[in-house]
């Protein structure tokens, strides 16, 4: 839903459970990405920054970053068949764009100011993620002896204000 809101017409679903990729084989994930790269033959791949490993606390993001970075060069060699058996048709994307919460060494920044409303609306569509983030804040508040009950209830009923807060906060960092 969020991808369609941004104008992305095709999403390839790997049917992997969120927040559980830490238990998934990096080699198996890389193999899936090799297959996708060879099948789709993208000019550009946009993914998590593998060099921001130390700055990312989400194991899913780290696993995707490393596996995809490896797949983007191994897809060009016949020694890495992916899941295919027999004849392998190597393919390499021309460009790679990385992103992250805190990138190790930024090389480019895009000004998305004119898209901020669209970005906020798309972020709002990630209801489960936003509720999980709010739950983490609520739990930390409870540990610190601070009640965030009203905040958590507000996010549960309508995530839009929280999405806007996150988008605006990320813009302030840059």
PLM features per residue range, with description:
Residues 3-17:
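A conserved beta-strand->alpha-helix junction
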Residues 19, 23, 27-174:
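Metal-dependent de-N-acetylase/amidase catalytic core
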């Amino acid at each position: 839903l969020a991808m369609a809101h941004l104008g992305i017409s095709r999403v390839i679903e790997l049917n992997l459970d969120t927040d559980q990729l830490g238990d998934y084989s990096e080699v198996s994930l890389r193999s899936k990405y090799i297959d996708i790269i060879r099948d789709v033959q993208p000019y550009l791949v946009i993914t998590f920054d593998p060099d921001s490993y130390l700055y990312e606390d989400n194991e899913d993001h780290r696993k995707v970053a490393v596996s995809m970075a490896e797949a983007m060069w191994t897809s060009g060699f016949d020694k890495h068949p992916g899941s295919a058996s027999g004849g392998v048709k190597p393919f390499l994307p021309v460009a790679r764009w990385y992103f992250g919460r805190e990138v190790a060494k930024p090389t480019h920044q895009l000004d998305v100011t004119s898209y901020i409303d669209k970005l906020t609306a798309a972020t709002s569509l990630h209801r489960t993620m936003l509720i999980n983030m709010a739950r983490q804040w609520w739990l930390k508040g409870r540990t610190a002896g601070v009640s965030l009950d009203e905040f958590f209830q507000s996010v549960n009923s309508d995530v839009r204000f929280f999405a806007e807060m996150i988008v605006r906060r990320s813009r302030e960092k840059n």
